[in-house]
Amino acid sequence: FSGKKFVNPDLARKVRQAAETLGYSVDRVASQLRSGRARVIAIIVPDLEDVFLGQLVSRLEACAQEAGYEVIVSSSRNDEAVQASRMRAVLGWRPAGIIVVPCLNTVAPDLLGEIGDVPIVGVDRIHPSTVDFDTVTIDNYRSGLQAVDYLAQQGAADVLLAIARRDLHNIQERVRGAQDAAAAKGNIVLDVVAI
């Protein structure tokens, strides 16, 4: 059932048919005994209603499935205490890894100490220089520059930048890039509004 060893295709088909007839499903706990880890990846995001985060989770689920992993998804509801609780809860599953979009700019150091050797990847709302694990981010400063440059090319003189939160590193960098681009142009009035 693991697909890790070659099995005669006819025999594999017969075994799968018998398993289906008997209602057999893989015992995840038993499978975990050999590796010490479940073939589960935990994804923790601040808000499942956020369009970007929803799309991110959907794509990560598809990639995990292609690689033979199941996914547990959880929302921290933009609350650091809930984020910590969710991370501690998924550690009980002994996941193969954790992907986290933190509520703020990092993951609490004491929580990282509890993770042990479980691989973790921080995505989006994270300042890469504040953590000792892999991160996936974009150049937020450059994004802000490019946005204002594009609007200036379209003839805009007044730009309103609507942001969700001022306390997130990625948002601060986008605002800084937009402000620098507006200042460099000299004829752009940039207003930043938190919504």
Task: Name each model feature, range by range.
Residues 1-39:
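N-terminal helix-turn-helix DNA-binding module of bacterial transcription factors
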Residues 26, 35-49, 63, 67-69:
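Interdomain hinge and pocket-entrance segments immediately C-terminal to HTH DNA-binding domains
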Residues 81-94:
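Short, well-structured alpha-helical segments in soluble
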Residues 77-78, 96, 100-146:
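Flexible loop/hinge segments that line or gate small-molecule binding clefts
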Residues 64-75, 160-162, 178-195:
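Short beta-strand elements in bilobed, periplasmic/extracellular small-molecule ligand-binding domains
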Residues 134-161, 183:
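Hydrophobic alpha-helical segments within soluble ligand-binding/sensing domains
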Residues 91-102, 158-163:
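Periplasmic-binding protein-like
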